[in-house]
From Swiss-Prot:
Main location as per UniProt: nucleus
Keywords: mRNA processing, Nucleus, Repeat, RNA-binding, Stress response
GO terms classed as biological process: mRNA processing; response to ozone
A Pfam family this chain is assigned to: RRM_1
Keyword Transcription regulation carried by entry: no
UniProt protein name: Polyadenylate-binding protein RBP45B
Keyword RNA-binding attributed: yes
GO molecular function, one term: poly(A) binding
Length: 405
């Protein structure tokens, strides 16, 4: 069982001393005495960072992308995790422009490329201290980092019917014991309740092991319940693409209509059918209707609940289906349609082409580095909440729940 984050997102044994450092929400990293507090500009979103030269070669990159962040994991949390390395320069958690909520990923800058590489090799897929059921998810934050970036293929499976106590680590070890090519595992968590949704994903680097696992592990117990295994969208080793659960951090278009449960799917391969689309998206909840307009390279998936549509948007944006990378956004809200016929609703929202939907390309973590100026965050992000905007919600009071990241 995993604990909910303490109030304010501060780890239980990381409470800061009553001093001037508190104005930055500083935490003593891992109980190391004498660690210097972070500079003010690191924690003030409005502060302008000093300009610096953007790296031009792989050996100059000193920034890591970090994903799978919980809504309460802020810059203070990242500092508490990595400042003990002695070479952390700054951190930035990406937030939604409208709500100010954490989008699930961020960036950490180190003093040198070598320092960043040591952290990447040491912490990637390692348990987070004080939260051992959650794993660090790290990668290089630049497309130019060449073969040092993990662009190997990902072959992913869906794992359903998980018990409430199954965490990322438990799921990972369940499969790693039999399949050496397992690269990672993710149990999907409901952001509202903090509880597992009862399903997750496991990534392999070997396609033959993925295929074997789909047969051999179906019905095998994980914790107290037998698992239900199925196919999931996979990354085929193309630079800049992201795996099925890592894409949860992608910045898809926000929809504020509580009644809209429809997802637009762009860039479909011609071989993908309505049934194929339904099988992939049904992993995220009950589906009301699926439609791929004749002759079009896009489709629509309507869920019974908005939360299911949100999860599908987070998980599937930018993955491969049928040989192409799909792009997801919100479809037209049912409250805006003029006809009660579902088929008319879908066709009516299609317009003159995929661009009419205004869907966004999946925001690969590396794409942000084009605007990231090495020593600060003055370019490209545009994620800082506007003045007068409500701050992110505080995490709930500490309690015991079935949790994993």
């Amino acid at each position: 069982m995993m604990q909910q984050p303490p109030p304010g997102g501060i780890l239980p044994h990381h409470a800061p001393p009553p001093s001037a450092q508190q104005q930055y929400g500083y935490q003593q990293p891992y109980g190391i005495a004498g660690a210097a507090p972070p500079p003010p500009q690191m924690w003030n979103p409005q502060a302008a960072a000093p300009p610096s030269v953007q790296p031009t070669t792989a050996d100059e990159i000193r920034t890591l992308w970090i994903g799978d962040l919980q809504y309460w994991m802020d810059e203070n949390f990242l500092y508490g995790c990595f400042a003990h390395t002695g070479e952390m320069v700054s951190a930035k958690v990406i937030r939604n422009k409208q709500t100010g909520q954490v989008e699930g990923y961020g960036f950490i800058e180190f003093a040198s490329h070598a320092a960043a590489e040591r952290v990447l090799q040491t912490f990637n897929n390692a348990p987070i201290p004080s939260f051992p059921d959650q794993l660090f998810r790290l990668n290089w934050a630049s497309l130019s980092s060449g073969d040092k970036r993990d662009d190997s293929p990902d072959y992913t499976i869906f794992v359903g019917d998980l018990a409430a106590d199954v965490t990322d680590y438990i799921l990972l070890e369940t499969f790693r014991a039999s399949y050496p090519s397992v690269k990672g595992a993710k149990v999907v968590i409901d952001r509202v309740t903090g509880r597992t949704k009862g399903y997750g994903f496991v990534r392999f680097s070997d396609e033959s092991e993925q295929i074997r696992a789909m047969t051999e592990m179906n019905g095998v117990p994980c914790s107290t319940r037998p698992m239900r295994i199925g196919p999931a969208a996979s990354k085929k080793g193309v630079t800049g693409q992201r795996d099925s659960y890592q894409s949860s951090a992608a910045g898809v278009t926000t929809d504020n209509d509580p009644n809209n449960t429809t997802v637009f799917v762009g860039g479909l391969d011609a071989s993908v059918t309505d049934d194929h689309l339904k099988n992939v998206f049904s992993q995220y909840g009950e589906i009301v209707h699926v439609k791929i307009p004749a002759g079009k390279r896009c489709g629509f998936v309507q869920f019974s609940e908005k939360s299911c549509a949100e999860e599908a948007l987070r998980m599937l944006n930018g993955v491969q289906l049928g040989g192409t990378t799909v792009r997801l956004s919100w479809g037209r809200s049912p409250s805006n349609k003029q006809s009660g016929d579902p088929s008319q609703f879908y066709y009516g929202g299609y317009g003159q082409g995929q661009e009419q939907y205004g869907y966004t390309m999946p925001q690969d973590p590396n794409a942000y580095y084009g605007g990231y100026s090495g020593g600060g965050y003055s370019g490209g992000y545009q994620q800082t909440p506007q003045a007068g905007q409500q701050p992110p919600q505080q995490p709930p009071q500490q309690q015991q729940v079935g949790f994993s990241y």
